[in-house]
């Protein structure tokens, strides 16, 4: 799994993260919960190399640089508009997937599983907010990564599509991936989380030391 040790991250003089150790095992869904400002989204960005922090992050015992974590990780962001690049919904699912892995029916099955078959030929930016959310989650299922981060993945989803999202998240964990979910949604927690990590805001600025 993923092991975080001695992790510290600051915005200016304000320390946002101070984590002596955190274990994120393969094969289980770890939920990060806590109030706004607790550093949940910042931690996920550090985990996949989008932010640099002090400390060590290991995958299966091997220390990883930020660039390696970016290559091995996939993030479903809260702002899904920044993750849509294809000209059609169907094309979006195939982006970044090696041609040999695009077996017959795989894209169509994934579209159907996420209630997107009827909009397969539309431009992703023409979809509703909930449809865009489902598309980005479906795309996560298509790529083969080791670390999956879902930041508020149930935003804009009705109950039926929340259940299909929870199923996708569980499928990834059952494929022995590291899966982390940031959520305030109790229904999603109940549907997919194996472990819950409670995060709290740190008080005040970091101590300043002068040698």
Spell out what each predicted region is:
Residues 33-35:
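The feature captures the beta-strand-to-loop junction immediately N-terminal to the Walker
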Residues 148-151:
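Catalytic Walker B motif of ABC-type/P-loop ATPase nucleotide-binding domains
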Residues 48:
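Helix-to-loop junction immediately C-terminal to a conserved catalytic motif
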Residues 123-127, 131:
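Conserved ABC ATPase signature
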